[in-house]
């Protein structure tokens, strides 16, 4: 499920590529006094993910932008919508917006047999744990996780994406339903790397880390109802890590064939 917000710039502003922490703060403010507030500092996926305010370029007063917020929990999105309606000023750092319109969306990859494409809306964070480095012939002396790069091959990326989505499936889907790792097929049929890049991300107040991210175009064919659920869950929660910082947000760009 998704909440689409139509935004209008309240003044001229330069686009702020370090929006992640600031936008996350507004979303957490919206979840105060809700059942989700307890997960603010929890070491687990919260469930929500979000796009950047797009298109990402400098703006003049009155220019339009769009923001998408996604989550598997309808009541979480309802809390965000209530907050956006009560306070239509949305200040993302030095980018001041007015929320003109809110719309709910329910994207769906389609019934079994449907083919389509899912594309990264924001950079995807995939890290390989140090205890798995040898299995993928990664030479490292560090105790820290290794950021995935193309030189590491597709195998660790696929494994980490599946493991991460497994965790989200356990949190947000009924326990009797099989998760992604319980199937005999991969999430996607095609993995087209668009680019890799490094950006500084403010992960908490005053703490900035540099993340190596990647953007992808994934092709899929829906195998069965379980696979449909897994792909739709990824649309709701995002792929990879740190989705609550706006990383790993994905969009359907072509489906229904």
Locations of the language-model features?
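RNA-interacting cores
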Residues: 1-257
């Amino acid at each position: 499920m998704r909440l689409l917000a139509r935004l209008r710039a309240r003044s001229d502003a330069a686009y702020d590529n370090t929006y992640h922490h600031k936008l996350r703060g507004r979303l957490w403010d919206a979840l105060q006094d809700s059942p989700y507030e307890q997960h603010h500092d929890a070491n687990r996926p919260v469930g929500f993910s979000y796009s950047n305010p797009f298109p990402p370029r400098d703006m003049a007063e009155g220019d339009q932008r769009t923001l998408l917020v996604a989550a598997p929990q309808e009541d979480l999105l309802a809390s965000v919508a209530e907050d956006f309606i009560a306070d239509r000023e949305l200040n993302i750092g030095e980018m001041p917006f007015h929320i003109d319109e809110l719309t709910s969306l329910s994207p769906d990859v389609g019934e079994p047999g449907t083919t389509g494409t899912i594309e990264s809306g924001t950079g995807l964070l995939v890290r390989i744990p140090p205890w798995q480095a040898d299995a993928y012939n990664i030479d490292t002396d560090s105790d820290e996780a290794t950021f995935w790069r193309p030189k590491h091959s597709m195998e660790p990326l696929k494994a980490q994406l599946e493991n991460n989505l497994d965790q989200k499936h356990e949190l947000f889907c009924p326990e009797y339903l099989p998760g992604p790792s319980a199937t005999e097929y991969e999430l996607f049929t095609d993995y087209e790397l668009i680019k890799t890049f490094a950006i500084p991300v403010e992960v908490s107040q005053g703490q900035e880390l540099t993340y190596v991210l990647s953007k992808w175009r994934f092709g899929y064919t829906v195998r069965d109802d379980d696979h449909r659920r897994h792909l739709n869950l990824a649309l709701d929660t995002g792929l990879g890590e740190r989705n609550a910082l706006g990383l790993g947000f994905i969009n359907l760009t072509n489906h229904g064939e």
